[in-house]
Amino acid sequence: MNKIAFIYPGQGAQKAGMGKDFYAYSPLAAEIYDKASEILNIDMKALCFEENDLLDQTEYTQAAMVTTCLAMTAVLEDAGLHPDVTAGLSLGEYCAIAVAGGMITEDAIRLVRKRGIFMQNTVPKGEGAMAAVIGAETELIEKCLAPIEDVSIANYNCPGQIVITGKKLAVEQAVETLKAAGVRRCVMLNVSGPFHSPMMIPAGEALDQEMTDMQWSELKIPYVTNVTAEYVTDIHETRALLAKQVASSVRWQASMERMIADGVDIFVEIGPGKTLAGFMRKINRNAKVYTVNTVDDAQKVIEEFRQLII
């Protein structure tokens, strides 16, 4: 018996035109976009489907990504394809929790809009930075970072790809230290803040307050949290984990390894791009990964797994 995981990408995967074919194809998907436009007072179709300058601004990106990923998921689930477990990278974790049954679509969209605003406004522009470290051993990176204050690891994405985060000068110092240690590729990222660093703790605190009056539901299936790379089956843990997540390392590689060890053998990446599929090729080449970012992709996945659909 196959075990299926739905996995969701994070900020940075967004692109103009994402989800446009789903809106035209599925009334369920269209309803999610229209509902998001209504509750946020944003033209979500213009934001997601047309070239614009807002899509790459954190306060808009996060709501656009979650709306799109949940609209795509609605098409799969309407056809009867459901996951046994979910996970999402950073922002994608909100999709994972919503699909696992922990929060309704409207609340997920509303909450990530606030999250985006908090994250964008917590640290003044230019004070924080992030950099991708390519092709280096994790132990070497951790050793190089240890003596440097105000820099830490944001993402353990996969073997050979680590993202560091923190104060701009500290990240730049870390990059120079890594290069001196023989690391060939360090790329400064074009981001609006030092995400997943302790500098984001105030954003986590604001997010925690925002969740005070939210209605949570018991999880129908588990999700794997970025913070610990462990299964979450109790919704009461979720608020604290989400508040902590914005200032904590994303343990994506360990999350995928945890799922594989638990018998997950099919991963469906839902959302724009193929970032997570690329990570998985370096984590475990034997894992079967399908990407769904067009209606054609969705139809192929539904057809392939028709025998799993009850």
Residue ranges and their predicted role:
Residues 11-13, 101-247:
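Alpha/beta catalytic cores of group-transfer enzymes, especially the acyltransferase/condensing modules
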Residues 23-24, 147-148, 179-181, 281-285, ...:
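Short, solvent-exposed amphipathic alpha-helical segments in soluble enzyme
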Residues 77, 179, 260-261:
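Non-catalytic positions within long, well-ordered alpha-helices that form the structural scaffold/packing
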Residues 228, 288-309:
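Short, flexible loop segments at boundaries between secondary-structure elements
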Residues 2-140, 189, 266-296:
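FabD-like malonyl-/acyl-CoA
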Residues 248-264:
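A short, acidic, amphipathic alpha-helical segment used as a generic capping/interface helix at domain edges
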